[in-house]
From Swiss-Prot:
UniProt motif ('HIGH' region) ranges: 128-138
Alphabetic keyword roster: Aminoacyl-tRNA synthetase, ATP-binding, Cytoplasm, Ligase, Nucleotide-binding, Protein biosynthesis
Subcellular location: Cytoplasm
The name this protein goes by in its record: Arginine--tRNA ligase
Record-linked SMART domains: Arg_tRNA_synt_N, DALR_1
Length: 565
């Protein structure tokens, strides 16, 4: 069943198509800048005036008359007013606004969802190297990735969550050597503990207490499980390969605990090493060579990435024979495409910005049918943590940064998710621990969850069957607070679509805060459980629909919707 807005948009599209073939596809409503001007605004007359060589206001009058003659506008629209150079301000009948309540209650968890489009996509996120605990930056990426997956699911996509990790790089060697020295009884600060000569303030080895934990368990010959595999240490401090495998498995297990605490589950963990063992890296390189997209210079192999928009050509294979880090990335994305993922989104830190052009250049040069601009990227900044008014920089667990687990333990999973999603990904963010645990209206997650719990309390006090509310008479919902609440509910589907298209889960947090604010205003203005049965049931239906949308929006963010607080 079409929603009221969809029905009106379809009517608008039909009239625009009559005026100018092809224009119907651009049918859209906007929210008026001033609420008193109406419920929807339409700028189509101004957009079409120039190509049709007509005066925009005259065209607006023509479009207004055509729309007023359509059955849909006659059914749902109270008035269409023309303003300025050709704006159409559309005012809905009360019944149109009330209809949104029935739509929410009938569709429940699926309100705002689009039909299955029969296409699958992949979102890669977190993808932390197995060299230490997940830090708060990984937490921001985890929250972003999971919410973006949920948003795309509402738009009919089959979504695959993937975690890619580097189990074959220099950092793994550093992890292994750090663990080996700890197992031999050495510690940071000892003469044999290396320091990076180019940056003395930065230790070349890992210094966190977790390295000692790995070494202790290695010496105790313990068994760890990660990625559905088990690995047992042999306790031999000279067995470098055994130490490496045990340390990687240990930290994968620890990272899994962090992800479980965050209620985050991946469909697949993809190992970088498999790209080499399966020959995918070499296949990609040979394809680029055979296509004439490389050249040799100074003993290195270069990709002609400037042919595809990069600012300079890039080294693929160094003089020592090792590939640079973007080469396996190219091979990995070729495999993503070959696995059937027509759309891919990568969530990464802003420090990866420089890799985008070279990876896309490699994919275009590979000539396997991958479209330009593949994959999409969402880049995020790091997170600053403040507690007690002071910045927190060090974690005993990690040795040099605040971990995701620290943040969850200090606050809650819900607070971490909501807070880390409350700003655009590329915006610097300060996480205020004290605010995240405050039980007041200044805490945004508390404010939204409290609105949900408050509604549940009213529904429980009523004690009736909420399923019957979708059939009640809603004509009593006429006050300004009720009207504002219904209009906000009606915006939810379009907000989901816009947030998904823009990879912008922060839009969901803004929407929920506004919906919660409107509910609290309505609750303060109108008593729900009144003696008049018709009024009471209508108000109960409105708050029940509000509860459902609060629940749905919080679910997109991966945040719980408590019934009591």
């Amino acid at each position: 069943m079409l929603s009221v807005k969809q029905e009106l948009l379809a009517a608008l599209a039909g009239e625009l198509e009559t005026l100018s073939p092809g224009a119907g596809a651009r049918a859209a409503f906007e929210s008026p800048k001033v609420a008193a001007h109406g419920d929807f605004a339409c700028t189509a007359a101004m957009q079409l005036a120039k190509p049709l060589k007509l005066n925009p206001r005259s065209l607006g009058e023509q479009l207004k008359a055509a729309l007023e003659a359509t059955p849909s506008f006659q059914r749902w629209v109270d008035a269409i007013e023309i303003a300025g150079p050709g704006f159409l301000n559309i005012r809905l009948k009360p019944a149109a606004k009330q209809q949104i309540i029935r739509e929410v209650l009938e569709q429940a968890e699926k309100f705002g969802w689009l039909a299955d489009r029969g296409a699958k996509m992949l979102v890669e996120f977190v993808s932390a190297n197995p060299t230490g605990p997940l830090h708060v930056g990984h937490g921001r990426q985890a929250a972003l990735g999971d919410a973006i997956c949920n948003l795309y699911a509402t738009q009919g996509w089959g979504v695959h969550r993937e975690f890619y990790y580097n189990d074959a790089g220099v950092q793994i060697d550093t992890l292994t050597k750090s663990t080996q020295l700890r197992a031999k009884g050495f510690k940071p600060g000892d003469e044999c503990w290396p320091i990076d000569p180019e940056n003395p303030a930065s230790k070349a080895f890992y210094n966190g207490s977790y390295i000692q934990d790995i070494a202790d368990d290695f010496l105790a010959c313990k068994t760890v499980k990660a990625d559905d595999r088990e690995f047992t240490a042999n306790g031999d401090v000279e067995d470098y390969d055994n130490i490496r495998q045990f340390a990687v498995a240990y930290l994968r297990n620890e990272q899994d605990k962090d992800l479980q605490a965050f209620n985050l589950h991946f469909d697949e963990y993809y190992l970088e090493s498999s790209l080499y063992t399966n020959g995918y890296v070499e296949d990609a390189v040979q394809r680029l060579i055979a296509g004439g997209h490389t050249y040799e210079l100074d003993g290195a192999l270069w990709l002609k990435s400037t042919d595809y928009g990069d600012d300079k050509d890039r080294v693929m294979r160094k003089q020592d024979g090792n590939y640079t880090y973007f080469v396996p990335d190219v091979a990995y994305h070729i495999q993503k495409f070959k696995r059937g993922y027509s759309k891919v989104v990568n969530i990464q830190g802003t420090d990866h910005h420089g890799t985008i052009a070279r990876v896309r250049a490699g994919l275009q040069a590979a000539d396997v049918g991958i479209p330009a601009g593949y994959p999409d990227y969402v880049l995020h900044t790091m997170v600053r943590v403040v507690r007690g008014g002071e910045e927190v920089k060090i974690s005993k667990r990690a040795g040099s940064y605040v971990t995701l687990r620290d943040l969850i333990e200090w606050t809650s999973k819900d607070a971490v998710r909501f807070f880390l999603l409350s700003r655009k990904p590329d915006t610097e963010y300060t996480f205020d621990v004290d605010l995240a645990v405050a039980q007041n209206n200044d805490n945004p997650v508390y404010y939204v969850q409290y609105a949900h719990a408050r509604i549940c309390s009213v529904l429980a006090a009523w004690g009736g069957d909420a399923a019957t509310l979708k059939d009640v008479d809603l004509s009593a919902l006429e006050g300004p607070q009720a009207q504002a609440l219904m209009l906000q509910l009606a915006k939810y589907p379009a907000m989901l679509t816009s947030a998904a298209e823009g990879n912008a889960p922060h839009d969901v947090t803004f929407y929920l805060r506004e919906l919660a604010s409107l509910y609290h205003s309505y609750y303060d203005a109108e008593r729900i459980l009144v003696d008049d049965e018709k009024v009471k049931l209508a108000r109960l239906a409105l708050i029940s629909a509000t509860r459902q949308v609060l629940h749905n929006g919080l679910a997109v963010l991966g945040v719980s919707a408590p019934q009591r607080m």
